[in-house]
Amino acid sequence: MAFSLYDASVANYLQTLGAVSGFLQRGLVHFCEKNIDPDTMVEARLAPDMLPLRFQIISVAQHSRGAIEGVQSGEFRPPAAKTPYDYAGLQGLVAQTQEALSAWTPDAVNALGGRDVVFHLGDHKLPFTAEGFLMSFSLPNFYFHATTAYDILRTNGVPLGKQDFMGRMKMKKS
């Protein structure tokens, strides 16, 4: 069995998005049990110079759904840092991202291989191939922001463990 662009990207995005959805839900339950308004967590951050939970979740969506759409269009831009969301809105964004990525078939994603993609960052333009963009830029950023979101919740008392981050693994079928 060949390992495809779909396997390397969308399948991994969906696994981790499932985990992100799960740990956001665990966070909601925890905050409600502790009489903490979950919306106050939207601006929580690990350090003063890091962007908040809101931006981490927006970036998870941008570096998954947005990355595949960027490969399709040939252009990718970073997310807007100031997009307003409450906690429920962040959960909805993850659900919408999962739904949109689930609509992509392996054949459709694999057909994007070899395309040119330009990452626009201000006045800078960084040229990539689809494979280079997804593997060396999109996936590392996706995992960074998913991990940072997990860490923000964890440092705010949400009882999370490694399995909460791992999500549903792709086990061998007997």
Please tell me what each predicted stretch does:
Residues D49-R77, T97-A100, T105:
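Conserved alpha-helical segments that form or flank metal/cofactor-binding pockets of metalloenzymes
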Residues L28-P48, L112-F119:
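Short secondary-structure junction/hinge motifs that connect adjacent elements
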Residues G27-K34, W104-A111, T155-L160:
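Surface-exposed helix-capping loop/turn segments at secondary-structure junctions
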Residues L17, S21-L28, R65-I68, A95-S102, ...:
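Structural signal for well-ordered, non-membrane alpha-helices
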Residues A2-Q15, D37-Q62, A80-L90, G122-N141, ...:
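Alpha-helical scaffold segments that form or flank carboxylate-/histidine-based iron centers
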Residues G66-S73, D151-P159:
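Short helix-capping/linker segments at secondary-structure and domain boundaries
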Residues R154-S174:
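C-terminal end-helix/capping segment
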Residues K82-L153:
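Acidic/histidine-rich alpha-helical segments that form the ligand environment
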